[in-house]
Amino acid sequence: MKRRIASIILAGAMMASLTACGSSGGAGQNAGGKTGDGAKANELTVWCWDPAFNIYAMEEAAKVYQKDHPDFKLNVVETPWADVQTKLTTAATSKNLDTLPDILLMLDNAYQKNVISYPDAFKDLTGNGVDFSKFPTAKTAYSVVDGKNYGVPFDNGAAIAAYRTDVLKEAGYTDADFTDITWSKYQSMGEDILAKTGKPLLSCTAGESDLIMIMLQSAGGSLFDKDGNPSMVGNDKLKKVIETYVSLVKSGVLVEVNDWDQYVGTMTNSTVAGTINGCWIMASIQTAEDQSGNWAITNIPKLEGVSDATNYSNNGGSSWAVTAGSKNPELAADFLSKTFAGSVPFYETILPKSGALATYLPAADSKVYGEPQAFFGGKPVYAQITEFASKVPSNNTGVYYYEARDAVATAITHVVSGADIDSEIKTAEDTVKFAMGK
């Protein structure tokens, strides 16, 4: 997940300073949450990161809310995700929840671990004015524990397949040929394109599991069962994913690189003819301004011979949590319900400058989301991606999600080098069980 947060903003916003702190009206920023009786009835404190993306969105949300609540004040404290996690853990384990802000931003894949581990640290938002039906089920599922909603969804991590249309044309293909296809069809066409142009279709960072998890979730697969227990051995979907990945590598259609910078470079330097990742990768693609008009977006390939296989998945994203330390939990819930969970104009405002693509489904019908994007062949890609998000299958992340991802990534590395798939899957599951103390 390296540099995922930095990569989510679009090209124009990527050049913005990442050092400034944001606040919207009223009180200045401070290093932590509220203290003692200092909280005011019309004031909220928020922890989040990235001035050009998350902080900017919060500032604009405050402006929207202030139209009907002119005395409302929002203090945004720029806090990197790693620090949010550390401070949250410290506050929860020390039972000192007053050190937390009213609202904090949490990575979707970290929700289950934090809410299950620290159930007293978060407010249940179910029945607090947020209409969760306005968001994709797969998105809200990240922050639902025991049937209760603990997060208001924000940014979109819907998976996309992006292709260099000029390279496809050189080999006799169009992006339409890559829409609603299977991975075997993808590999077959990829081998043909490689032979004709010398360019692989796909690249990824060796030793990371993002593509594996995208494939797995596209069929509703998980590394854990519904009770949070490791479910890798005997997991037909996982085995199919690994087999597919290894086949792509051995065919030359997928090329592995050493790090994130090299991965981005394969696209911007025209080494590969496409990529498959969360939609935030569009920001990195668009840094190659000379390629404008030569990219197209469509859905991802699906697995064959697997139940519930789809052409849709997810990678990344985050949601807003209201903490149990909030002195104004009703205000926090109302603020989120009127902005991130209730305002299409808000999302229309933040999209052009930050590239903050919503998971709020009504936004997909707005004129702004439907505007053609010259870089991507004049297609309305934002509306397209929002539609993709509505079709993503849910999966079980579990408390030990990141440990499981790492174990699977190690297994993949070994299998690509010739190790037995079943043995590596068992080793991965044993590794997670050990981490869980089982």
Feature map (PLM): residue ranges:
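Short, low-complexity disordered leader/linker segments with a strong preference
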Residues: 1-45, 67, 423-426, 430-438
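Short, well-ordered beta-strand elements
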Residues: 39-51, 72-77, 102-103, 150
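Extracytoplasmic "Venus flytrap"/periplasmic binding protein-like
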Residues: 64-136, 170-172, 271-274, 288-289
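Extracytoplasmic/periplasmic solute-binding protein
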Residues: 146-154, 159, 169, 184-231, ...
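Glycine-centered hinge/linker elements that transmit conformational signals in sensory
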Residues: 187-192, 228-257, 300
